[in-house]
Design a protein with these regions (language model features):
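Secretory/organelle targeting and membrane-embedding segments
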Residues: 1-161, 165-509
Length: 509
């Protein structure tokens, strides 16, 4: 969210109706409603606002409002002010029906007409698909047939699509084609909630608003980059979804590639959606697309076995409900990628993500090259602390720089130290869900933090050889790791064979 002092200077979003498909689901309760409450509390929701929930469950408006009130109290990131909550809940109504039933859209159209007159939302509509990916295409097509997404009389119509956007390159292209039959590209907002996190948004500010980093942000000074998205959570109740998806599809083309593109992109000519998204897409186009043999060489896929996390026993992945007992789906993926351009030639990017690991940690770690000469004879270069710039996303949002300094005393003894910036030390913002900025930006028509079709397809193009190679290998080559560990040993070997080492997950060293 915005700093409290600056939020007051930001205008509320324009009048609009916010339609959520899948309104009875987990995403709406845990993230969307708390995010809308936070926007309302900061005065960033318009007075002329309406929220319409759409789901299969039969429910009255009153029952839906009460359901969301309970969710708000359970999942709010700040203390709930009942006056603000009441003001928000009064704007909410509900339409029951299936996403592929034409009757649903007749009822939705009638409800939109009603709230637009009653609330004065001026015909502006924001549709949010908080549904399984299989529903994206039917909902978009039904909106098109009903004419609900057609822009007219100066009013805007926008659609937010959750990840995963496709399951491979072919399906991503097909989904883009289908959406573009109904809406223009500038109406489609492909959301990645990682881009709502302050540290992620701060990457561009760190690079381009400070004169000290960009001159050394290149192959002459950077040895390698590590991007880690580690989760201590297991698959849990998502067995059916996960066993048809896996860690690679679930995390890499979206979360990890968004981080990679922000780290590796060239400076945009302007800070606007077109320029920023063009540079992000261009750097993904420059990532070397591997052959299947190269993909096997430069990757590791793993699956967790039984173990312990936080002193609690964890059963193996294959015993999870709705998971096949002989499943070869990966719960861990590690890749080595390279970027074929002037800035990054020869600099490896190591990516890893996994479930049921020893610690929850998301970070980008940029390793700078060692000093070229051992001037301090009693401290060989190999004993000097490594110079890392670490951008921590979760569990704590921070930026730290690790470097060498003299240890106090009469001799020249050298030790590693770090300088750390934590958001909570400088800004008084209440915690957020990460969705507030994204929802607000969509309402005002700012697409900088959203993916464009070419960027999505570029990501799948990079991932496709890994998907194809792993599918062909089946169970062969699948590594195993204990739940509560740092991942498979083969992942350690992947980076070790390239002369580097992963940072630890527990304390980030």
């Amino acid at each position: 969210m915005m700093h409290n002092g600056s939020a007051r200077k930001i205008k509320p979003a324009p009048p609009c109706s916010f339609v959520v498909f899948g309104a009875s689901g987990d995403l709406t309760h845990r993230l969307l409603v708390p995010a809308l409450y936070n926007l309302a509390a900061e005065g960033l929701l318009p007075e002329a606002f309406a929220l319409i929930g759409v789901a299969r469950t039969e429910m009255s408006n009153e029952a839906f409002r009460e359901d969301l009130r309970k969710a708000l109290h359970e999942f709010a990131t700040r203390k709930v002010d009942e006056k603000v909550a009441d003001r928000l809940l009064k704007c909410i109504s509900y339409v029951d029906g299936a996403g592929d039933d034409e009757e649903t859209y007749k009822k939705l159209g009638a409800e939109l007409e009603r709230v637009e007159k009653a609330r004065g939302t001026e015909g502006n509509r924001l549709f949010y698909m908080a549904t399984p990916p299989s529903a994206f295409r039917p909902i978009a097509c039904a909106l098109g047939r009903a004419g609900l997404a057609r822009e007219e009389n100066g009013a805007w119509r926008r659609l937010i699509v959750e990840k995963p956007f496709g399951t491979d390159l072919e399906s991503a292209r097909a989904l883009n084609r289908d959406l573009l039959k109904v809406l223009n590209e500038n109406q489609i907002y492909r959301i990645d909630h990682y881009l709502g996190k302050e540290t992620v948004q701060n990457i561009m500010v760190l690079r381009f608003a400070n004169g000290l980093f960009e001159p050394i942000w290149n192959r002459q000074h950077i040895d390698h980059v590590q991007i880690t998205v580690a989760e201590s959570l297991t698959v849990g109740r998502r067995g059916r979804f996960y066993d048809s998806t896996g860690a690679l599809r679930d995390m890499v083309p979206n979360h990890l590639f968004q981080l990679l593109s922000l780290i590796a992109m060239e400076p945009p000519a302007r800070f606007d959606a077109r320029a920023v998204r063009s540079e992000k897409a261009e750097v993904l186009e420059a990532v070397q697309v591997l052959t299947e043999a190269e993909a096997l060489r430069d990757s590791v896929r793993g699956q967790y076995t039984e173990g312990r996390i936080a002193e609690k026993p964890v059963e193996e992945y294959r015993k999870t409900k709705d998971v096949r007992p002989d499943s070869t789906i990966e719960t861990y993926a590690a890749l080595k990628l390279t970027i074929d351009n002037w800035r990054w030639a020869g600099v490896p990017f190591f990516l890893r993500t996994g479930k049921a690991l020893e610690s929850r940690r998301t970070e980008v770690a940029i390793k700078f090259k060692q000093a070229p000469f051992a001037m301090f004879r009693e401290t060989p270069i190999e004993r000097l602390a490594q110079n890392f710039l670490v951008l921590g996303v979760q569990p704590e949002e921070h930026i730290s720089l690790q470097f060498n300094a003299k240890i106090p005393g009469p001799s020249i003894a050298i030790g590693g130290v770090d300088m750390t910036f934590r958001y909570e030390d400088y800004f008084d913002d209440a915690p957020s869900t990460g969705y507030e900025t994204l929802i607000y930006d969509c309402m005002i028509g700012d697409a900088i933090l959203f993916q464009r079709a070419d960027g999505v397809e570029a990501g799948w193009r990079i991932v496709q050889p890994f998907l194809d190679a792993w599918k062909e290998k089946g169970g062969d080559g699948l590594a195993f790791y204990k739940a509560g560990s740092s991942g498979p040993a083969e992942a350690e070997n992947l980076i070790k064979n390239n002369g580097r080492a992963w940072r630890t997950l527990v304390n980030g060293e």
